[in-house]
Amino acid sequence: MSGKPQSPENQARQLIVAYQQYQAEAESLVRELGLIQMTAEGLDKAISAIGALSKAAEGQEMLVPIGSGSFAYAKLSSADRVVVNVGGGVSIEKPAEEAMEMLRARRSAISESSKKINEALAKIEQEMARIQAALERLERELQKQGGSEGFVQ
């Protein structure tokens, strides 16, 4: 690389490319946050359901969700044991309290992941604001020179 300074146009191009990269990364993080939120909601529902089941009597008739807002009638055969997914498509039977603790631990981990992603997103947004300000300065500089129709949108 030579020692001479870059032209404002080249600086602007580089800043625009960097801005677009940050923007794509931010969009990806926002999508990831959406998935994390859905997972957290599912965990919250499971924890709540296990809590409600522990208060139900064996043999009690209840409505069980079967998907798409549809339910089936069922009788509770055991309130003290539930089947939980442990990952990799594997589900195991656990005591209800142990299952709740496992789900709470997952929920806590999900919350921590969400916090870290939000922190990363805030840093990206700060960088994007810094780049935007630099582009606006370059645009003003180019307009003073009379050589630009503008490039900041």
Swiss-Prot record:
Keywords: Chaperone, Cytoplasm. It is found in: Cytoplasm. It holds the Pfam family Prefoldin. One of its GO terms (molecular function) is unfolded protein binding. Its main location: cytoplasm. Molecular chaperone capable of stabilizing a range of proteins. Seems to fulfill an ATP-independent, HSP70-like function in archaeal de novo protein folding. Belongs to the prefoldin subunit alpha family. NCBIfam families: prefoldin subunit alpha. This is Prefoldin subunit alpha.
